Swiss-Prot record:
Transmembrane segments: none
Protein name: ATP synthase gamma chain
Gene: atpG
Known role: Produces ATP from ADP in the presence of a proton gradient across the membrane. The gamma chain is believed to be important in regulating ATPase activity and the flow of protons through the CF(0) complex.
A cellular component annotation (GO) from this entry: proton-transporting ATP synthase complex
Principal cellular location given in the protein's record: membrane
UniProt-annotated location(s): Cell membrane
Organism: Streptococcus equi subsp. equi (strain 4047)
Recorded topology in the membrane: Peripheral membrane protein
GO MF annotations, alphabetized: ATP binding; proton-transporting ATP synthase activity, rotational mechanism
GO biological process, alphabetically ordered: proton motive force-driven plasma membrane ATP synthesis
């Protein structure tokens, strides 16, 4: 019985230590989430403005025609997917949701292998490579608050593959941050961008920008920046969802640890009570034997 009590006590102490670790990790993820949400809000100001300007320029350029490859829809022979996952685990179902979605899409539409994957995040890279899938580029070790300098190269490479007709359309697959408890898998078509902006161009009025030397020349310079901003925004969004998932996972782990501690404490008290009762019974039995 003494051995049983010591074993239960050791489990309680071990679980308490684990609970402290997961609680600390939850607080770290919470702090990262606050920073990411602020970064997303700040970036949205820039993203909204560049979208407005691009939409305005496209209104006239789409009607006059354009040979810019980023605007041209061509027969789809191969598709590119930028897939954003985390570099580490302990984020609940964050990675499994996005990986399941991309696998379902590939199995349904690309049985012949007519796709290329640009992987951001070690979890996704290892997952795809273990299955012998087509990974064109990868980026590991993404910062908690990723700067454009860190991701700019892989974004430019992705856009360049479309422009050079290595693939004919480009999607970004990531977890969209809704709130601290919820994220949604989002598969967003980035290129060609004519469809992406056409609806807004049809609905909104002309903003009346006066640009030099002319709208067409400015648009040629602006389109790559606009597309890169969309992809970068998706990366920030995904990173925010990752921090939220990490915070939720660690909160769940902490709560579960507390439940385990409570159960073990009850088990310990019952075992201790049984041991005391047994000792009293043995003492009484011994006293009766002496009479």
């Amino acid at each position: 019985m003494a051995g049983s009590l010591s074993e239960i006590k050791a489990k309680i102490i071990s679980t308490e230590k684990t609970s402290k670790i997961t609680s600390a990790m939850r607080m770290v993820s919470s702090a990262k989430l606050v920073k990411s949400e602020q970064a997303a809000r700040d970036f949205q100001i820039y993203a909204s403005k560049i979208r407005q300007i691009t939409t305005d320029l496209l209104k006239s350029d789409l009607t006059t025609g354009s040979d810019n490859p980023m605007l041209v829809s061509r027969p789809v022979k191969k598709t590119g997917y930028i897939v954003i996952t985390s570099d580490k685990g302990l984020v609940g179902g964050y990675n499994s949701k996005i990986l399941k979605s991309i696998m379902d899409m590939i199995q349904e539409y690309h049985a012949a292998g007519d796709y290329e994957i640009i992987s951001i995040g070690s979890i996704g890279s290892d997952f795809f490579k273990a299955r012998g899938m087509n990974v064109a580029f990868e980026l590991r070790g993404l910062a908690d608050q990723p700067s454009f300098d860190q991701v700019g190269r892989i974004i430019s490479q992705s856009v360049g593959m479309f422009v050079n007709e290595i693939f004919d359309e480009l999607y970004v697959c990531y977890n969209h941050h809704v709130n601290s408890l919820t994220s949604q898998v989002r598969v967003q078509r980035m290129l060609p961008i004519s469809d992406l902006v056409a609806e807004e161009a049809a609905e909104e009025g002309v903003t009346g920008f006066e640009l030099e030397p002319n709208r067409h020349v400015i648009l040629e310079q602006l389109l790559p920046q606009f597309t890169e901003s969309l992809i970068y925004g998706a990366i920030i969004d995904a990173k925010t969802a990752e921090h939220a998932a990490g915070m939720t996972a660690m909160q769940t782990a902490t709560d579960n640890a507390k439940h385990v501690i409570n159960d073990l404490t009850i088990q310990y008290n019952r075992a201790r009570q049984a041991a005391i009762t047994q000792e009293i019974t043995e003492i009484v039995a011994g006293a009766n034997a002496l009479e």
